[in-house]
């Protein structure tokens, strides 16, 4: 029997295929926007910690890139390696799946999760959209057969439905430990990293079907001057055509990207923000391991 008053702290990996709701789930658990989201697969590229401290419990969530089948480019290999690494040395794994849809990429994640030694929680997302819950049963039964030791929790990452039950299960599995981070810290990532991610999110949301995935963002300046935070961001693409798409007709699109990113930055950093954006062509960066490392993508 666990001691409900004990101080507990541990790492919780959130894994799943691309675009299944992992980052949205993390944001709702934290009660604020930390991880960027869009309707496009592979929005998340890096592991990022989201830290939630409530009383004696500190859960350190690891938001991961969606595992996907393509290893075509160095960037794809980096994301898959990053997501797989998150399954090691964590105390709990949350495997996020769709309420009924199952893909080859879900199967890929399942095959990795089946080797996990510790507690696994299956978070069945978007269950609020099903009126007749009996429709879920065949899928849930099959999932339970694949992961017989996993606990199953139906949730809605978008609406925040049933997250209390999910967090209760997580807390139960965290080891007794002193807290690793101060109570008011919510992430391990720098403000520069968060600013770059916000710009990239707005690009992904603005471009829709025109979206070139070969885009990254580098913060060249991040400086507080008086009451204003000055941020210079460089948007890196692979081709001249992509540069033209991002800039848009008479610069209208990049202006919208900047306005939306600035609004979110002012909320996140609690400061007036002066944001300047530039676009640069760096051919083949997404398949160049040296370039990826220089842009903060770590070891491949």
Curated annotation (Swiss-Prot):
It is a peripheral membrane protein. GO terms for biological process: ribosomal small subunit assembly. It comes from the Bacteria. Residues 8-176 form the Era-type G domain. GO terms for cellular component: cytosol; plasma membrane. Residues 63-66 are annotated as: G3. The keyword NADP does not apply. Gene3D superfamilies: 3.30.300.20, P-loop containing nucleotide triphosphate hydrolases (3.40.50.300). Its main location: cytoplasm. One of its GO terms (molecular function) is ribosomal small subunit binding. It is found in: Cytoplasm; Cell inner membrane. Residues 42-46 are annotated as: G2. Residues 16-23 are annotated as: G1. GTP binds at residues 16-23, 63-67, 125-128. Keywords: Cell inner membrane, Cell membrane, Cytoplasm, GTP-binding, Membrane, Nucleotide-binding, Ribosome biogenesis, RNA-binding, rRNA-binding. Residues 155-157 are annotated as: G5. InterPro entries: G_ERA_dom (IPR030388), GTP-bd (IPR006073), GTPase_Era-like (IPR005662), KH_dom-like_a/b (IPR015946), KH_dom_type_2 (IPR004044), KH_sf_prok-type (IPR009019), P-loop_NTPase (IPR027417), Small_GTP-bd (IPR005225). It holds the Pfam family MMR_HSR1. PROSITE patterns: G_ERA (PS51713), KH_TYPE_2 (PS50823). Residues 199-283 form the KH type-2 domain. Disulfide bonds: none annotated. Belongs to the TRAFAC class TrmE-Era-EngA-EngB-Septin-like GTPase superfamily. Era GTPase family. Monomer. HAMAP family: GTPase_Era (MF_00367). PANTHER family: GTPASE ERA, GTPASE ERA, MITOCHONDRIAL. This is GTPase Era.
